[in-house]
Amino acid sequence: MIRLSIPRFGLLAGCLLFGGALQAIAQETNEHAQENAPSVAQIVALDECDPATFNANPLIGPGFCKNVTLGAFTTLTELLDKAAHGTPDPGWDFEPDVLHIKKGTTLVVVDQGGEPHTFTEVEKFGGGFLPVLNAPGEVTIPECAGGFKNVAVAKTRILQGSQLLVPGLSKGEHLFECCIHPWMRVKVEVK
């Protein structure tokens, strides 16, 4: 038989109440932390460069295209021909094309293609810094001017297998494109 005196009972009750209060505070703090935890959204850069034809070109050089996908390949000639006719290769793409995120979300852009890309914020979509890849009549937009000699463009370059973090986007619409392959475009809506 257990005998508790009034002081011991009071002490036990007080400990239980204190423990319950601590648990409630901890749970509320955890829920608040989860609500305010920074979130991320991923964008993937894709391409289907053919290593044999891209790397054989003396202007590009060996090791440029590191495509390891099992999908179809596009030769360099095919890519240039499609761009010249205003029908860019859909294998070069950012996914998703449109993204809705909350303010405070960090974009993580991952290059899962075989060649370098940029993820450059632009005022409006337009031509990149390689005229041969621009649609007929499309001119290089200011944000892409100068290519990699422009530090602002160079900072947005992503190499095969690497990633780029884009934190702190303000509310509203943000447009991004690849300054090399200007048909690779993403619209990000920040709420």
Regions picked out by a protein language model, each given a short descriptive name:
Residues 10-21:
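Bacterial N-terminal signal peptides
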Residues 2-11:
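Bacterial N-terminal signal peptides that target proteins for export
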Residues 25-191:
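Extracytoplasmic copper-binding redox domains, predominantly the cupredoxin/blue-copper superfamily
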